[in-house]
């Protein structure tokens, strides 16, 4: 087996234990695995941001000021997000390979830890909804990375009639532009989510606007609660 990131051969240490016990298949070598920055320690109880990365003046107890502003200034209900990795330079490079270079096989690297994170925080959700790409973006890429991540979870993935209008890439916009922009998401169909706890799945949580734009539509259609599971927290 070769590492999906660097293509180096992955060797296994042979012992009596490995002779009798089936090893889990590895998709990444030890050297590349060290590049993955897992979120550990204290986090914002809402958005999951590592609190050690937040200056003291930008947090109030165990909540960051971004989440407080979303509730107090923007009027959005509190929303729980949990992420697996810090969106640092190493993860940016890996996600670029995953998303923009069309390497969908990289989802295998994240399958088990992403699934474990789900089971830790969201075992009681009703359904998972991946964030859609616009038709143009999905055609360019050949797949939707959020759908691949959602397929890792032991829960029904609901591919709804939720659609996304083609807009400028979020990564090219400043925070203020993202928050003040028009909601690009809409439902084509008549799906309802009466009293359901809906989990939105995406690759990166940065400002939180995407999940709240979709969340507002879900609440309008009867959802009891909306949460979010993402691969990385920016």
Give a label for each model feature.
Residues 1-234:
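Glycine-rich phosphate/pyrophosphate-handling loop used in enzymes and phosphotransfer proteins
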């Amino acid at each position: 087996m070769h590492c999906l990131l660097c293509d180096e051969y992955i060797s296994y240490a042979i012992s009596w234990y490995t002779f009798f016990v089936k090893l889990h298949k590895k998709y990444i070598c030890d050297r590349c695995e060290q590049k993955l920055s897992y979120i550990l320690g204290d986090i914002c109880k809402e958005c999951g941001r590592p609190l050690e990365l937040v200056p003291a003046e930008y947090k109030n107890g165990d909540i960051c000021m971004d989440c407080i502003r979303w509730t107090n200034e923007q009027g959005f209900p509190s929303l729980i997000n949990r992420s697996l990795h810090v969106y640092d330079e190493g993860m940016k490079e890996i996600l670029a390979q995953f998303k923009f270079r069309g390497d969908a096989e990289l989802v295998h690297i994240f399958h088990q830890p992403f699934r474990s994170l789900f089971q830790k925080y969201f075992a009681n959700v009703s359904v998972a909804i991946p964030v859609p790409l616009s038709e143009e973006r999905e055609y360019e890429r050949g797949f939707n990375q959020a759908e691949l991540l959602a397929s890792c979870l032991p829960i029904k993935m609901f591919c709804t009639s939720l659609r996304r209008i083609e807009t400028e890439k979020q990564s090219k916009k400043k925070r203020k532009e993202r928050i003040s922009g028009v909601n690009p998401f809409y439902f084509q169909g008549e799906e309802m989510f009466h009293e359901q706890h809906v989990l939105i799945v995406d690759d990166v949580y940065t400002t939180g606007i995407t999940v709240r734009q979709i969340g507002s539509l879900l609440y309008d259609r009867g959802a009891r609660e909306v949460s979010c599971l993402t691969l990385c927290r920016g």
